[in-house]
């Protein structure tokens, strides 16, 4: 059984492509992370309540499609403000929206799994 940090994983609102997130979850577990997988099409305003019930060390949001209007300008900054843990955005949507994601206070993890895990490792190590 893994004893590493617990990561909350879910797809962005309107995102139904879970395969990349599932591959990421497998790679994270292989690196001794624990994973709380919420699945596709998750509204971001529900995440703080989940974190209250099951404390996690980071939130990982996944997306490959075009983000919903206002997602990175409104909902993402609100999530960052309403949680005290790092919020990462990964997948193709992250590559195309890096500046907007970072302006929202989240961390762009990119679309490739191994480098994304490196970014998460480094961020969580610095916070410890």
Regions found by a protein language model. Name each.
Residues 31, 82-83:
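Helix C-cap/helix->beta junction micro-motif
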């Amino acid at each position: 059984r893994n004893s590493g940090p617990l990561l909350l994983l879910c797809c962005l609102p309107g995102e139904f492509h879970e395969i990349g997130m599932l591959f990421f979850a497998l790679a994270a577990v292989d690196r001794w992370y624990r994973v709380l997988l919420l699945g596709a099409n998750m509204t971001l305003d529900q995440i703080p309540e989940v974190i209250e019930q099951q404390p996690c060390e980071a939130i990982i949001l996944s997306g490959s499609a075009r983000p919903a209007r206002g997602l990175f300008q409104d909902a993402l900054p609100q999530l960052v403000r309403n949680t005290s843990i790092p919020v990462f955005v990964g997948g193709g949507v992250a590559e195309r929206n890096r500046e907007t994601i970072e302006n929202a206070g989240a961390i762009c993890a990119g679309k490739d799994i191994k480098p994304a895990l490196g970014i998460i490792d480094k961020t969580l190590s610095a916070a410890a």
